[in-house]
């Protein structure tokens, strides 16, 4: 959570600076496109039990570390208030099996988790413009590297996301942005070599801060 807190703090500083400096600015409106470039923390909330393929307890749980990445988001406003946003970026995570006397790396893997959200912007013509959204995501696990004699398969799949954020005008088409998403995603992780599996609820917090440009 330390990286998430750092990204959120940086984003709040950006938005406060933007609010203080904003003079003439371009408001949100129907037909507007917005490109957002952000620094994003992805912090999974894993910790589910690892069982044998027969369902017996092993006393271990699956943990997944956080990572920080650059992300790109593109929004299109259908009306002054309603927009759709697509974001993409990729992170690298380590899956670890943990127990009372165990702390073993199982796999390192890259994750591509694009999210498509439908948003409602409450004050499109204001300098400080908050919004909420909801959407779907698809988790793609790729370029994995197994560790310590494990052979782990992690299933790709769909999840859904809730979102809240704020855009603060800086100057002209430029704005500062803070965005928080909660992604709900569950997957199966199977170790083919050792005959164990885990149904892992990743459910990451996705916290971003950056700048947007309207065109």
Give the ranges of each region predicted by the language model.
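Aromatic- and Gly/Pro-rich amphipathic surface segment
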Residues: 55-73, 77-79
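Predominantly the C-terminal beta-signal and adjacent terminal strand-loop region
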Residues: 48, 93-97, 171-215
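Outer-membrane beta-barrel biogenesis signature
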Residues: 15-51, 120
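Short coil turns and loop connectors of transmembrane beta-barrels in diderm outer membranes
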Residues: 18, 31, 80, 124-130, ...
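Gram-negative (and chloroplast) outer-membrane scaffold detector with strong preference
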Residues: 24, 36-43, 72-146, 204-215
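Gram-negative bacterial Sec-dependent N-terminal signal peptides
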Residues: 1-22
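Outer-membrane beta-barrel translocator domains and adjoining extracellular loop/strand segments
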Residues: 47-54, 95-103, 142-151, 188-195
